[in-house]
Amino acid sequence: MNFQRATPSVEQGQDPPGLQAVLARVHWVLVNPSHPGNVGATARALKVTGFHQLWQVDSNQALAAQRLLDPQAIAMASGADDLLQKAHHAQSLDQALQPCLLSLAFTARPREFEPPRRSLQQGLKEALDLLRLYPEAPVAMVFGAERAGLTNDELMSCSRVCGLSVNPGFGSLNLSQAVQVVAYFLRHLVMQEGLDEQAKGQGQGQGPSVSGSPPALAPAASVQALYRTLQQLALASGYLDPKEPGRFRDRLQRLASRTQLLEDEAQLLHGLSREILKRLG
């Protein structure tokens, strides 16, 4: 089924350059998808809304590549197989999220330990604000495996948790359908807020001056490095029992996710922790 375009494009079949630039900074991350057809259908859902940064997380790179070449994936992509050909691969979710300033995890199940929970509208608005303030940085939308969804550890690797408003008596939503809903609303928000026009102006040298730029936020890679160092410090100091670490890392992640660390703050805490580790010997 074809729908008439809501906005004019520079060339027939293309979004305006400003809109393309914004949508290119949204990474769509599928964690251990089990069915090739769902990956293909997800590619179609993304292409029809103008997104094209498709990521697969799978420790088995050969299996991930095979999934993209599967006839079911190509058939379900229905013309979006170019997204399958250009799809990115990461060995772990942490690796996939390294450059991202914000990651929204989509799950219906509440957990004991989870990042701050947001409605779909709140989460996408937060992502939109970061896309506006930091015109080079990416954000990520993260979806778990079809049967079990995201694990607790995968969930804690993300910045925020979002759910979709569905029938509580029947909340089962296909992976590609969930992606389609989120992609549509995010595209709509980008256009409604005029972010595509801002990106167009920045591309023509009309962006904000360097002096007016916001402070650099810590990407996921810096935050992950800080978590590792703090855990090493807790072990070296005797504060943490290696045989019973409990939920120490989860608590750290939950604490940090309540705010958005600046890059210099993350480096300060990381450097201080490393120095203490050296002195502990």
Segments and roles (model prediction):
Residues M1-G281:
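Post-transcriptional modification and biogenesis factors for structured RNAs
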